[in-house]
Structure formats: structure tokens, C-alpha cells
Amino acid sequence: MESISNQGLTLLLGGARSGKSSLAVDIASRTQREVVFIATAQALDADMQERIARHQRERPKWLTFEEPFDITSAIKKAPSSACIIIDCLTLWVSNLMMRETSEQEISSACTKSLSAISQRNGKTIVISNEVGLGVVPETALGREYREILGRVNQQWARAARQSLFLVAGKAFPLHDPKEILQ
């Protein structure tokens, strides 16, 4: 598997309500650059519609691309010097799986997105959930999702300059196991 390194890429991992999105917003706000928000959520119910509307009200000056499937095209639309937040890989992988996209195609889409990010000058902050810490999912689809998302997270972490794991609003740096074994 091809490894793309990007010095401007930060990956934020954690569970639900762990502080990932808040930290991403804080990091982006401190860059003093234009911020582009790439949202992968789909407004399929009233709760998600309200959540999306609230996020848009909270960040009216940010350029938002709602892109549940092709994040590479959204990355390429963003100004090169802008700070991008991609929120989140968790829903993106789910969206692709619901379209019956194979794991190989998902991995290829990750590679294309990472390549697009490596062409940019601005910082990119990517959010994803770590879903492998809980109980084993009851359904085959749930287990397949957990496995694919875990491998997707690893692919993005390998490319990132910095990966952080968030728990209860606290961030822990993640280290490459190869560094530990040296």
C-alpha cells in the first residue's frame, strides 16, 4: 500500500463527544487563514438537519462543502492556502459502504484524497471516530464497517504529521510503533 506523507495533515481520533470537532475548530481558528469545512454527513433526518444548521450558524464565515462521497473533489475545490477540516471519515466510510463500495475502492479513494492534500499549502485537519474500542458489533455489516474504518484510520494516520486520540476533551499524541521499537 502506497504511503503518502503530508506535513500539514493532522488526524483527530476518538469516540463520540470526545472533543474532536471542538479541537479541530480551535486549531483552524488559530491558523488565521480562510477555513473550508468539508462535511460528510447527510441530512437524512430532522436531528441531522438541525445539527448541520447549527454548525453553519456557528461558523458563518467558513466555506462549507457538503460532500458525502467524493471528498477528493471537495479538497481540490478549496483554496490551496486555506485550512481544511474534514468532518468526518466515520460517516464518509459509512456512506461509501451503503453504496456498496468495496474496501479496495475505499482505500483507493483515501489514497487519492491524501494525494490531493499533499499538493496543498494549507493545514488539513481530519476527524474520525475510533469505533474498535467497544463491543463486537452484532451484525456482519457492523463488524465489516468496524474493520474497514480501522484500516482507513491507519491509512490516514500513516500519512499524518500528527495524530491525536481524544478522550473526555483531553488529547493524547499517537506514536508510530516503529519509533517505539527502535
Predicted features along the sequence, with ranges:
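Pre-Walker A adenine-sensing motif
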Residues: 1-4
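Flexible, compositionally biased loop and terminal segments
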Residues: 10-13, 38, 90, 110, ...
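Conserved P-loop
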Residues: 6, 10-78
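Short, well-ordered beta-strand core segments
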Residues: 35, 84, 162-165
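Structural motif
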Residues: 11, 85, 125-127
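Helix-adjacent hinge/juxtasegments
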Residues: 62-108
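Residue-level signal for inorganic ion chemistry
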Residues: 24, 55, 85, 129, ...
